[in-house]
Amino acid sequence: MSAEGYQYRALYDYKKEREEDIDLHLGDILTVNKGSLVALGFSDGQEARPEDIGWLNGYNETTGERGDFPGTYVEYIGRKRISPPTPKPRPPRPLPVAPGSSKTEADTEQPVLTLPDLAEQFAPPDVAPPLLIKLLEAIEKKGLECSTLYRTQSSSNPAELRQLLDCDPPSVDLDVFDEHVLADAFKRYLADLPNPVIPVAVYNEMMSLAQEVPSSEDYIQLLKKLIRSPNIPHQYWLTLQYLLKHFFKLSQASSKNLLNARALSEIFSHVLFRFPAASSDNTEHLIKAVELLISAEWSERQPAPALPPKPPKPTSIANNSMNNNMSLQDAEWYWGDISREEVNEKLRDTADGTFLVRDASTKMHGDYTLTLRKGGNNKLIKIFHRDGKYGFSDPLTFNSVVELINHYRNESLAQYNPKLDVKLLYPVSKYQQDQVVKEDNIEAVGKKLHEYNTQFQEKSREYDRLYEEYTRTSQEIQMKRTAIEAFNDTIKIFEEQCHPQERYSKDYIEKFKREGNEKEIQRIMHNHDKLKSRISEIIDSRRRLEEDLKKQAAEYREIDKRMNSIKPDLIQLRKTRDQYLMWLTQKGVRQKKLNEWLGNENTEDQYSLVDDDEDLPHHDEKTWNVGSSNRNKAENLLRGKRDGTFLVRESSKQGCYACSVVVDGEVKHCVINKTATGYGFAEPYNLYSSLKELVLHYQHTSLVQHNDSLNVTLAYPVYAQQRR
């Protein structure tokens, strides 16, 4: 048995973002069952415009995966007869039975039963039927963020659903059912009502209103008035209101469940109206009516803001956040030069409006990045700096980053971008981070440092091995895809040769038969068989290569999955290790001892092994502090010096200093922050009471922990060599 479907070709690579998605690679062929599009309310002809459909569910013939993929990433090829999938099929949404029509085959086996009329199921002050309330509460509890809710049919048969609906509401335990069974039971409930929630009696008047009233707001008010007519029991209006509240809650989570007002109206309009067969125009009017009702519910019920995470200690907004004269380094929400991965970790599972600021990854002087939580995702906003002014876009009007942030703590960012209708509510404070180190003596902390460093090194080696395998597999897959394309071209050429040869061979065989030339007939047959055999060999080779490619693609996805699972552990282990290392450094532990715990064998730096560092030139600030010098002068002073030669100067960034150091024969520059907690290169390392203390620490500690390109210590003060 086969069904009708559509074929699409991937135009771009797509890496899946959700569990139900599938990966796409350029050129992949995908098949979508026609029934799945019909179930979502799409009509014939729309399949040719996948970008208008949005997300499609189908089968990737290249990789053998089934799941969702974006319509904007594919192009339509044509129709195809397909076999329905055998493992856990995803059937199209069943259509409701129109009044007066015969039941489906599945339903003929069941007794024709309906629920009591809504007017008989409850009465005010109740707001809806008890069973309906219990069903929707369970669905909202379990499946509010489920991306397949109301789109995927459960495995329960009609008899089981009917049995669930016939239960006594107070006694039934809905926790034993998953969200898809509950969703099917809800749909079955609406379908089994003797009359639809929006009565048939208002259908004709409603269609007239749709054509006569152009204003959406006026139409909604008249539609509500129509449904609340004295001729219709009040329970119908109360039930509709309760359903709209449910749809409103679902649409609030549409970034995760994909159920916006339009999608919900397409799914439920037919069962809310349950009208006789109508034209497509009328159907669209009814879908639009439900969409407007849900949207009106949205506008009438603005959601309360999410509660912020409770901070360890209260912070006074008046004293802290709203002080425009505060230095940027002292702002609790400014984290300096931290990575995007660390930002994502700090903002994970936080409320909308949570934010922090870091240095821009472009490293342009004075540019920063605001990361803001909105709609469950992180939004990155560039803060530009030009001519002493700051802002998100031209014209730049704020005198400082602090003033900019304070402004948007009171005003919505919708002023800047209409899609960012949120304020900067909850700063991620660098002063309120959890204390990682729990041990209370140096030896115990050192042992823990050794354990975490060992785990970090093992994870790093595993990640590096997987990355090499990932790169190699990616290259091999690309080569095999190229080879398959070459096979396809070759087969096409041979087949083009085969067709005319068959025609000519047939003519010549007839001719030689008449002449009795058996030898020529045998030669023609032999050549024809040889060509056919060659085509078969090429097709077999292509098939084997396609099987290899399919296996390797599965391996490739598995490697990628393992890499993604390791990466968060790697980041967390590094952060924990660095916290222990920082704690020991603050306690004055010597680098030699730290190297033992870290397992560092390279301890040949002439300063790192000196037991008594009193003779170090670093103690004399005049050997490295050059005062108000600029970048060009610093580079001239350090040009030609050996790696590790350094100086410290005042930075063009107000209130900060800059360290210039020779690395791999080049002069590099990095900012030294001056904050309320001390000097340092980045949070949470701004803890040195003076520049001298910072220089002495990094005399034996590499700067690589702050910047991968700075694998060097502050070994040689620029003027120390001249004084020897």
Swiss-Prot record:
Tell me the Gene3D superfamilies matching this sequence.
1.10.287.1490, Rho GTPase activation protein, SH2 domain, SH3 Domains
* Tissue spec: The P85-alpha isoform is widely expressed. Expression of the P55-alpha isoform is highest in brain and skeletal muscle. The P50-alpha isoform is abundant in liver with lower levels in brain and muscle.
Residues annotated with Phosphoserine modification: 154, 279, 608
Entry-linked Pfam families: PI3K_P85_iSH2, RhoGAP, SH2
Cite a single GO BP annotation.
myeloid leukocyte migration
- Which residues does the record list as N-acetylserine (modified residue)? 2
Name positions with the PTM Phosphotyrosine.
Answer: 467, 580
Compositional bias (Pro residues): 84-97
- GO molecular function terms noted in the UniProt entry: 1-phosphatidylinositol-3-kinase activity; 1-phosphatidylinositol-3-kinase regulator activity; ATPase binding; calmodulin binding; ErbB-3 class receptor binding; insulin binding; insulin receptor binding; insulin receptor substrate binding
PTM comment: the record says: Polyubiquitinated in T-cells by CBLB; which does not promote proteasomal degradation but impairs association with CD28 and CD3Z upon T-cell activation. Phosphorylated. Tyrosine phosphorylated in response to signaling by FGFR1, FGFR2, FGFR3 and FGFR4. Phosphorylated by CSF1R. Phosphorylated on tyrosine residues by TEK/TIE2. Dephosphorylated by PTPRJ. Phosphorylated by PIK3CA at Ser-608; phosphorylation is stimulated by insulin and PDGF. The relevance of phosphorylation by PIK3CA is however unclear. Phosphorylated in response to KIT and KITLG/SCF. Phosphorylated by FGR and ERBB4.
Per UniProt, which keywords does this protein have? Acetylation, GTPase activation, Phosphoprotein, Protein transport, Repeat, SH2 domain, SH3 domain, Stress response, Transport, Ubl conjugation
Q: Where is this region: Disordered?
A: 80-109
Q: Where is the SH3 domain?
A: 3-79
Family the entry assigns:
Belongs to the PI3K p85 subunit family.
Tell me the PANTHER family matching this sequence.
Answer: PHOSPHATIDYLINOSITOL 3-KINASE REGULATORY SUBUNIT, PHOSPHATIDYLINOSITOL 3-KINASE REGULATORY SUBUNIT BETA
Q: What is this protein called?
A: Phosphatidylinositol 3-kinase regulatory subunit alpha
Organism of derivation: Rattus norvegicus (Rat)
Gene behind this protein: Pik3r1
